[in-house]
């Protein structure tokens, strides 16, 4: 399974992004194959913050449309939200201090 980064999500969503065609084609290909892929929650948050931001885009995506885009992706049977478990902080801390 692969995780899709914020940059791919933004480029695929925004038709005015310079790499829209490539990113959109990549996501469409993943969808057509039906291979499992993941949306990390931090990337979902970053996507929402980016595409709706008026300082980034002259015509930002309305929040409702951005939420619908994420909802469509998460609604696909082969897309999985990716999150850390409850032990994440303890494991990270132990690895960094070891």
Per-range role (PLM):
Residues 1-39, 54-69:
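Short, well-structured N-terminal submotif of metal-dependent ribonuclease cores
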Residues 29-30, 73, 95:
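Hydrophobic helix-cap positions at the C-terminus of alpha-helices
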Residues 39-44, 84-88:
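Short, conserved alpha-helical segments within structured domains
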Residues 44, 66-70, 89:
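A general structural signal for well-ordered alpha-helical segments in protein cores
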Residues 60, 76-98:
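Active-site neighborhoods of divalent-metal-dependent phosphate/nucleic-acid chemistry enzymes
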Residues 69-77:
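Short, solvent-exposed helix-to-loop capping segments enriched in aromatics
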